[in-house]
C-alpha cells in the first residue's frame, strides 16, 4: 500500500490515522466541538456539513470553514456532505452538491474533501479535478447500509475510485454475518497487495463489524473513524479504546 502525506501526516504508513466526526446543527455548536476535539489524540477531524442547518448558504459555509481551520490547529480537516442517498441528513441536487464542493475547495481551509462515488459518477472527474487544482485531497466514498457486496464487487468499486483520480478511496458496508466482515477485510488486503496505487479506507459497520475499525494496519485500511462522544455512523468505537487497540496491534 502506498502512502500520501498531507501537512506532515503520513496516511497509509504505520498505524491507521484516526478521524473524529463533528455532527452539530449550529455554527456555535460546530466550533465549540471543534475546539474540544482539537485537544484529543487524533489526526483528522471530519466536519459532517449535512448536519449544519445553513450548509447551502455560501457565506455561512465559508465562515464555519474558517472557524474550523482556526480551531483545529495542526489537525487535518476533512469536509463531508453526506447526502441522504448515502446515509446522510439531507438531499442535494447535483448542482447544489457541485456548488458546495466548489466553495469548500476555494476556501483554502480543508485538506480533504469527501466526494460520493455513486450519486456523482458522471461529475466525478470534474469534482476531483476541481479539488486537486485547489490542492485538496479527495476521499471518494461509497456506502451500503444493508449488505456486504462480494469481494470482487468491493475491489472493483475501490479500483474504479482510484482510476477516477481519488487520493483515498473509501468503502463502508454493512455485515449480516461474520463471514461478511471477513469479505471486507479480504477485499482490503487485496487492495493493499494488488492495487497499491493509493491508500484505502474501509470499514464493516455496526457492532458486528467493529473489529474492522481496529485492525487496519494489518489488513490495509489507512484511516479509521472513532467516536469522541457522538457517533456519525453505526459501530464507531470510543476514541480511547481505538487508541489503545491501535497501539497494541501496531506492527512497528
Language model regions located:
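Short beta-strand/loop segment at the start of cytosolic alpha/beta domains
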Residues: 1-7
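Active-site beta->alpha loop and helix N-cap motifs at the rims of alpha/beta catalytic domains
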Residues: 3, 15-133, 143-147
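Eukaryotic low-complexity, non-globular regulatory regions
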Residues: 8-15
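Catalytic alpha/beta core domains of metabolic enzymes, predominantly
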Residues: 102, 112, 117-252
Amino acid at each position: 500500500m502506498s502512502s500520501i502525506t498531507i501537512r506532515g501526516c503520513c496516511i497509509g504508513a504505520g498505524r491507521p490515522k484516526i478521524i473524529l466526526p463533528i455532527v452539530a446543527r449550529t455554527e456555535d455548536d460546530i466550533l465549540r466541538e471543534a475546539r474540544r476535539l482539537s485537544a484529543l489524540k487524533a489526526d483528522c477531524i471530519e466536519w459532517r456539513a449535512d448536519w449544519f442547518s445553513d450548509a447551502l448558504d455560501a457565506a455561512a459555509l465559508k465562515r464555519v470553514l474558517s472557524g474550523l481551520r482556526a480551531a483545529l490547529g495542526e489537525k487535518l480537516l476533512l469536509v463531508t456532505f453526506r447526502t441522504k442517498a448515502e446515509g446522510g441528513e439531507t438531499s442535494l441536487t447535483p448542482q447544489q452538491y457541485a456548488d458546495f464542493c466548489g466553495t469548500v475547495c476555494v476556501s483554502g481551509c480543508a485538506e480533504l474533501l469527501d466526494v460520493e462515488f455513486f450519486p456523482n459518477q458522471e461529475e466525478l472527474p470534474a469534482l476531483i479535478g476541481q479539488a486537486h487544482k485547489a490542492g485538496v485531497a479527495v476521499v471518494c466514498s461509497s456506502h451500503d447500509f444493508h449488505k456486504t457486496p462480494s469481494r470482487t464487487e468491493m475491489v472493483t468499486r475501490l479500483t474504479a475510485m482510484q482510476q477516477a483520480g481519488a487520493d483515498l478511496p473509501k468503502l463502508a458496508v454493512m455485515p449480516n454475518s461474520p463471514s461478511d466482515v471477513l469479505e471486507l477485510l479480504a477485499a482490503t488486503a487485496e487492495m493493499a497487495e494488488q492495487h497499491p496505487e493509493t491508500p484505502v479506507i474501509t470499514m464493516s459497520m455496526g457492532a458486528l463489524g467493529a473489529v474492522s475499525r481496529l485492525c487496519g494496519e494489518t489488513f490495509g485500511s489507512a484511516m479509521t473513524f472513532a467516536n469522541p462522544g457522538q457517533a456519525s455512523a453505526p459501530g464507531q468505537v470510543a476514541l480511547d479504546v481505538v487508541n489503545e487497540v491501535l497501539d497494541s496491534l501496531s506492527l512497528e
